[in-house]
Amino acid sequence: MNAGRPSLVSSRRERGAVEVLTVHADDVTEADLIGCLGVDLRRAIDAGAADAFVLDLSGVRFLTSAALGMFINIHAHLADRGCRLALAGAAGNVARVFKQARLEELLPVCPTVGEAVDILRPC
């Protein structure tokens, strides 16, 4: 599913134990793209040694309920490993979808990456 295409996710370590995964897609509405993004996120998570991850969605303008379901599956994948996830940078349509789905009841949804890192950072 990844043959010949660049990854939709880049990773950087932030304040030690928190890894920030940045999504490089502005329109997460096509089934193929959602599937590829899910694969790329799992690969980045499995390759990392962090116990907390921030998903930076600041570049995402549109997403579907299928994409929302994929993010929830990523959250469950991390929880099974004893890891935590926060979403950051959602604005406009994406923020509305998260609010309507009451996603903040399941995991932290923060306006900025910095706030998400602060929430997940070990004391």
Residue ranges and their predicted role:
Residues 1-5, 123:
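Intrinsically disordered or compositionally simple regulatory linkers and C-terminal tails
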Residues 2, 10-12, 77, 99:
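Short secondary-structure boundary/capping segments
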Residues 4-39:
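STAS-typified acidic loop motif
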Residues 115-123:
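Generic C-terminal helix-cap and adjacent flexible tail
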